[in-house]
């Protein structure tokens, strides 16, 4: 396995670790509605940071974006909005299926759809089937999916042992939402594929290869921001128990604390895709679809490890932890299989 591929896998792991940890600061926010907290964090992660980083990277910010036609920008924006819809459905999936089943189904579907649909859309899926390296990477995707399934099973055993139940368990509604979440969340993978002309233009301007994907986040995350912020603002305006004014009428020290914690959560959320861009840049072009598989499987892996570190599994018993450990090992094996496939 080449050093470039190894570094690509490592950057994806770091990005996934940030994704697995980003909600920790949000959990410390007090006396704010979820909608206010999510909006503040979202403004930081989806608007401020993408624009700021792009302004630092590009020699002429406005000239760069105005150089693209609407036919180039619109798919990137719409796929970003598609991801935003998946993001909203994610929370509802947890509500009706519980954390473990919801995450397992949603992540499993988005891993498959986001990974395999890209080469199908690009018309080169047959190359993957007919080459040794392609077949090995596909095997890695399958093994990763098995690993996600094992971790999901561990979560179910943990919830059963600890008596944790879904907020409003509804299998039919939850499955529909999980499938929708999985499909729509893959919009981020599709957006990255559609944004290739933007990456190439950034490279032509002298932007370092590690950073060429970052300017496209202004458009991708702009689409996601409109969906997420629109959802939050509509709820803040229509739901009687929610009030943006009330949330910002608390004592000033608490408001400052909540803003800083939400901003930190937003920063950590953004960092997952900052390092995703770094990892993506190191993956061979013919296997760039693998970036999504690495990100999602490492997200599950890091989520399990973070849960152990935070002692969320302390009262789960030995069996769930053993199953979780097995799932994590399988995901690590999958990453190695994919790495060897890309190197062959």
Swiss-Prot record:
This is L-rhamnose-proton symporter. One of its GO terms (molecular function) is symporter activity. Uptake of L-rhamnose across the cytoplasmic membrane with the concomitant transport of protons into the cell (symport system). It is found in: Cell inner membrane. The keyword Phosphoprotein does not apply. Its main location: membrane. Keywords: Cell inner membrane, Cell membrane, Membrane, Sugar transport, Symport, Transmembrane, Transmembrane helix, Transport. It comes from the Bacteria. It catalyses: L-rhamnopyranose(in) + H(+)(in) = L-rhamnopyranose(out) + H(+)(out). It is a multi-pass membrane protein. The chain crosses the membrane at residues 4-24, 38-58, 68-88, 101-121, 137-157, 175-195, 214-234, 259-279, 290-310, 323-343. GO terms for cellular component: plasma membrane. The keyword Transcription regulation does not apply. Belongs to the L-rhamnose transporter (TC 2.A.7.6) family.
């Amino acid at each position: 396995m080449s050093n470039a591929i190894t570094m690509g896998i490592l950057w994806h792991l770091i990005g996934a670790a940030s994704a697995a940890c980003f909600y920790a600061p949000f959990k410390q926010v007090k006396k704010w509605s979820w909608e206010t907290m999510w909006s503040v964090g979202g403004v930081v992660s989806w608007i401020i940071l993408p624009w700021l980083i792009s302004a630092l990277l590009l020699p002429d910010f406005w000239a760069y974006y105005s150089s693209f036609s609407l036919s180039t920008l619109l798919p990137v924006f719409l796929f970003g909005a598609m991801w935003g819809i998946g993001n909203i459905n994610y929370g509802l999936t947890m509500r009706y299926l519980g954390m473990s089943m919801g995450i397992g189904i949603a992540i499993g579907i988005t891993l498959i759809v986001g990974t395999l649909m890209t080469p199908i859309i690009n018309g080169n899926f047959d190359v993957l089937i007919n080459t040794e390296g392609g077949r090995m990477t596909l095997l890695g995707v399958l093994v990763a999916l098995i690993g996600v399934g094992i971790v999901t099973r561990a979560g179910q055993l943990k919830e059963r042992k600890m008596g944790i139940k879904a907020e409003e368990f509804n299998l039919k509604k939850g499955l529909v939402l999980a499938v929708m979440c999985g499909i729509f969340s893959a919009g981020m993978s599709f957006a990255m594929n559609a944004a290739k002309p933007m990456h190439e233009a950034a490279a032509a301007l002298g932007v370092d290869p590690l950073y060429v994907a970052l300017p496209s986040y202004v458009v991708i995350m702009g689409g996601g921001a409109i969906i997420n912020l629109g959802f939050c603002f509509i709820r803040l305006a229509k739901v009687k128990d929610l009030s943006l004014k009330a949330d910002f009428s608390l004592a000033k020290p608490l408001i400052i604390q909540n803003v800083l914690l939400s901003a930190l959560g937003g920063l950590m959320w953004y960092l997952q895709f900052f390092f995703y861009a770094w990892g993506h840049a190191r993956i061979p072009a013919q296997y760039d679809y693998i970036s999504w598989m690495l990100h999602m499987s490492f997200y599950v892996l890091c989520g399990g490890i973070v849960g152990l570190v935070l002692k969320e599994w302390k009262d789960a018993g030995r069996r769930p932890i053993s199953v979780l450990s097995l799932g994590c090992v399988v995901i690590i094996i999958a990453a190695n299989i994919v790495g060897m496939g890309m190197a062959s």
